Amino acid sequence: VLATDPDADRLGVRVKDKNGEYHDLTGNMSGCLLADYEIGQRNALRGLPEDGYLIKTIVTTNMADAIADYYNTGLIEVLTGFKYIGQQILGFETSKKGEYLFGFEESYGCLIGTHARDKDAIVATMALCEAAAYYKTKDMTLWDAMIEMYERYGYYKDDIQSITLKGIEGLAKIQEILETLRKNPPAEIAGYKVLKARDYKADTIQDMQTGEVSSTGLPTSNVLYYDLSDDAWLCVRPSGTEPKVKFYYGIKGTSLSDADEKSAAMGREVLAMIDKIM
């Protein structure tokens, strides 16, 4: 089952397994399905360029990193917003260095090809139908393909918690939450060690073990990001369109049930963190 929003730039997907049960795919899941299919097919049919890149936003699943590693392609992270993926494509074209392979974000947007500089659900729909037909020749459903990806790359699960804080007081509270975390970065989150703390407003990445500080290499933005042990992560940013502060997070499990449990534990920790700051 496929559905787009009214301007056809985001694609929602529900897939059926061999038992007739339907599964809703998150934007991370459908994006990874398409990334793996598009890059994998190109690799099989004509090979991949030495300077090819998969592009994702910083709040998008780390499974994308695993896909890039598997196919030995480059990976570029950009700030939230598909325009930043479009800017990378323009940069490839103007510099004559680098080739765009695929780009996506967790909020159900991706771009196949370079005909546009924004997410495109029309071409994504076509590609996903093509992928479904391809997997059917292997007696597989799209859900089977997703499970195969979990087995190959790891059982990644990503989620988000949002807190709505309206009005001038709410805006001040959102800033207070971010500044509190900025001044007091956690050493551990839900049992995961904080390996690096990224502050995109200060343009710094601090190694929490060595204290070494480097640049993010991205435009400044009021965003905090924590690289955690075991390929987990947490990102905090204010919404650009609503009076909300958003806590994005991701974990990697050893099975679907393990991933569910670890994600739920992370969610509880995030809520506890919010309550403590509030």
Language model features by range: what are they?
Residues 2-4, 103:
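Short acidic/histidine-rich active-site segments
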Residues 4, 11-35, 40, 44, ...:
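Hydrophobic, small-residue-rich alpha-helical packing segments that form membrane-like cores
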Residues 5-9, 107-109:
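Short glycine-rich anion-binding loops that position phosphate/pyrophosphate groups of nucleotides
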Residues 6, 240-242:
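A generic beta-sheet turn/junction motif
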Residues 21-23, 41-237, 244-246, 255-261, ...:
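Phosphate-binding and adjacent anionic-ligand microenvironments
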Residues 250:
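Active-site beta-strand/loop architecture of penicillin-binding DD-peptidases
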